Swiss-Prot record:
The lineage of its organism: Bacteria, Pseudomonadati, Chlorobiota, Chlorobiia, Chlorobiales. The active site is at K191. This is Glycerol-3-phosphate dehydrogenase [NAD(P)+]. Belongs to the NAD-dependent glycerol-3-phosphate dehydrogenase family. It comes from Prosthecochloris aestuarii (strain DSM 271 / SK 413). Keywords: Cytoplasm, Lipid biosynthesis, Lipid metabolism, NAD, NADP, Nucleotide-binding, Oxidoreductase, Phospholipid biosynthesis, Phospholipid metabolism.
Length: 332
């Protein structure tokens, strides 16, 4: 089996290494040719995943068309807002029978589409039953360090989800399956927004009570949006929901939590982003989800509060006061 991973960030590189170590022939494609050449020369992703040497079965692809044409499985590991642009590069390729696995987490800005929908819309030759996502609490730093990790492979087709499970499953990377691809994608995307809120609480100096409230009420927002889009309410209790939400809100590795923490300390969004080496998906996902929730009539007060702080320059203290002084309402 030949697998092509599109995107040589920390997560794409981690998965490429994992798959190569399982014995698959793996090609890793980077968007920038000069970066691809550096990866081929050093046999290590010094910029995004330092200290992890590439196994012999991992090749660096210079030509995305050749790499995708030869592949049985294509893994999309580019930033969420670059999925459409990257898929358009594959438009002239015969993708019949190829398994598509998206691992980016986000909602497309403007269209409000889930990333599996973006893939299907962009690549008309792809069978919808062959599209899947791989989500869950899985920081690249820990997976590449062979620390125990559990994730979920989701597809509307159970056989496809099981195939992804078989491909990625290892002794330390346990993969479950789920056919609720809508719920899995929504949970895995919106949790990044809630993590920004959790980081803001850290930056201000709030305690455990505030963090617990953000996580719990954030989960309620995820559940409402997922239900409005046809997702199974049970999915939010799984790995892509509560699992990924907890790790993203609490972890030192979380880029989204870090962005929030810096905002809470008084830095501007532009300043924080300009000094980061990697993408914090939750920033643009916040914009996309506010637009989507407005269109669907879904109440998401934490998400809207994060939006106000990030994009409307609302003072953090004022935003939190407004959030806390809303009219009382039932919990469930």
């Amino acid at each position: 089996m030949i697998i092509t991973v599109l995107g040589a960030g920390s997560w794409g590189t981690t998965l490429a290494v994992l798959l190569a170590n399982k014995g698959y022939a793996v090609s890793l494609w980077a968007h920038r040719p000069d970066f691809a050449q550096e990866l081929a020369r050093t046999r290590e992703n010094v910029k995004y995943l330092p200290g992890v040497t590439f196994p012999d079965g991992l090749e660096i692809a210079q030509d995305i068309n050749a790499a995708a044409t030869d592949a049985d499985v294509i893994v999309a590991a580019v930033p969420s807002q670059a999925v459409r642009e990257t898929m358009e590069l594959l438009a002239g390729i015969n993708l019949d029978g190829k398994l598509m696995v998206n691992v980016a987490k986000g909602i497309e800005l403007g269209s409000g589409k889930r990333l599996s929908e973006v893939i299907l819309e962009t690549l008309s030759g792809v069978d919808p039953s062959m599209v899947s996502v791989l989500y869950g609490p899985s920081h690249a730093e820990e997976v590449s360090g062979l620390q125990p990790t559990t994730v979920v492979a989701a597809s509307s087709n159970l056989d496809t989800a099981k195939r992804v499970q078989e491909i990625f499953h290892t002794r330390m990377f346990r993969v479950y399956v789920n056919t609720d691809i809508v719920g899995v994608e929504i949970a895995g995307s919106v949790k990044n927004i809630i993590a920004i809120a959790a980081g803001i609480a850290d930056g201000i100096g709030f305690g455990d009570n505030a963090k617990a409230a953000i996580i719990t009420r954030g989960l309620a927002e995820i559940s409402r949006l997922s239900a409005a889009m046809g997702g199974d309410p049970m999915t939010v209790s799984g790995l892509s929901g509560i699992g990924d939400l907890v790790v993203t809100c609490l972890s030192k590795h979380s880029r989204n939590r870090y962005v929030g923490e810096q905002i809470g300390k008084g830095r501007s969004l532009d300043d924080v982003i300009s000094h980061m080496n990697m993408v914090a998906e939750g920033v643009l996902t916040t914009k996309a989800v506010v637009e989507l929730s407005n269109r669907l009539g879904v109440d998401m007060p934490i998400t809207r509060t994060v939006y106000a702080m990030l994009f409307e320059h609302k003072p953090v203290e004022d935003a939190i006061l407004d959030l806390m002084t809303r009219d009382p309402k039932p919990e469930l």
